Regions:
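Class I SAM-dependent methyltransferase Rossmann-like catalytic core
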Residues: 15-29
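Conserved alpha-helix/loop element of class I SAM-dependent methyltransferases that forms part
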Residues: 28-58, 73, 77
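N-terminal, positively charged/glycine-rich alpha-helical extensions of SAM-dependent methyltransferases
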Residues: 1-19
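A short acidic, Gly/Pro-enriched loop at the edge of an enzyme's catalytic core
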Residues: 133-145
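A short glycine-rich, Lys/Arg-flanked "PGG" loop and its adjoining helix->strand segment in the class I
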Residues: 158-173
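Short catalytic micro-motifs in class I SAM-dependent methyltransferases
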Residues: 149-150
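Class I SAM-dependent methyltransferase SAM/SAH-binding core
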Residues: 58-134
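Hydrophobic beta-strand segment of the Class I
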Residues: 18, 145-146
Length: 176
C-alpha cells in the first residue's frame, strides 16, 4: 500500500480521537505552536498592496488541515481584523477573507465540518479532500499557504512544496 493510502487510512481511523491525542502527546504545546504560526500568517510583508493593512480579504490555503483547528484559528483572527478594518473604513466586500482546508482524510474533514458549523464559520471556511502533490487551484490563487503539522506525512515533499509555491500569489508567503 502506498504511503499516501496508509496515511489516509490511519487518520481516518484516529479522527474521532485525534484532537485529544494531539493535545496529550504534545503536552498542549500544539496550541502554542498554532498561536506562533498565526502571527506569521498575518505578518505583513513589503510589497503586498493587494491586502489591506489588517490582512482583510486574505485567501489562505491550509494544507493537511486535519480537524480544522488551525483553519478555524485563522478565520477567527480574520473576523477580529475585519472588525478593525470596518472601523477604518475598509470596503466590507474585501473582509474578512477565506480559508480553504485540504486534507487526505475524509474522517478528519468530517470532524472539521462539525467544528466549522458550530463556530458559525461556514461562509469563511471551505474544506475538501485533496493531495498537496496535485493541487486543483489556479496559479497564484492564495495570499498565504500553510502546513501546521503535516509535512512529516508528505509522500513527495518536493512536489508538495512546488505546488504550494505555484498556488501562492507572487510576493506572498508560505509557513509551517
Amino acid at each position: 500500500m502506498p504511503k499516501r493510502e496508509k496515511i489516509q487510512e490511519m487518520f481516518d481511523n484516529i479522527a474521532p480521537e485525534y484532537d485529544r491525542l494531539n493535545h496529550i502527546m504534545s503536552l498542549d504545546v500544539d496550541k502554542t505552536w498554532r498561536k506562533r504560526a498565526l502571527t506569521q500568517i498575518f505578518k505583513q510583508t513589503v510589497g503586498e498592496p493587494e491586502l489591506e493593512a489588517e490582512g482583510c480579504g486574505m485567501k489562505v490555503l491550509d494544507i493537511a488541515c486535519g480537524t480544522g483547528d488551525f483553519s478555524i484559528a485563522i478565520a477567527e483572527e480574520m473576523v477580529r481584523r475585519a472588525k478593525r478594518c470596518h472601523q477604518q473604513g475598509t470596503d466590507p466586500s474585501r473582509c474578512p477573507g477565506h480559508v480553504t482546508g485540504l486534507d487526505l482524510s475524509s474522517g478528519m474533514l468530517e470532524i472539521m465540518g462539525k467544528k466549522v458549523e458550530a463556530k458559525g464559520l461556514r461562509d469563511m471556511i471551505s474544506y475538501e479532500v485533496g493531495d498537496c502533490e496535485h493541487l486543483r487551484f489556479e496559479d497564484g490563487a492564495f495570499d498565504r499557504v500553510t502546513v501546521a503539522f503535516g509535512v512529516r506525512n508528505f509522500e513527495n515533499r518536493e512536489a508538495c512544496l512546488k505546488e504550494m509555491l505555484r498556488v501562492l500569489r507572487l510576493g506572498s508567503r508560505a509557513s509551517r
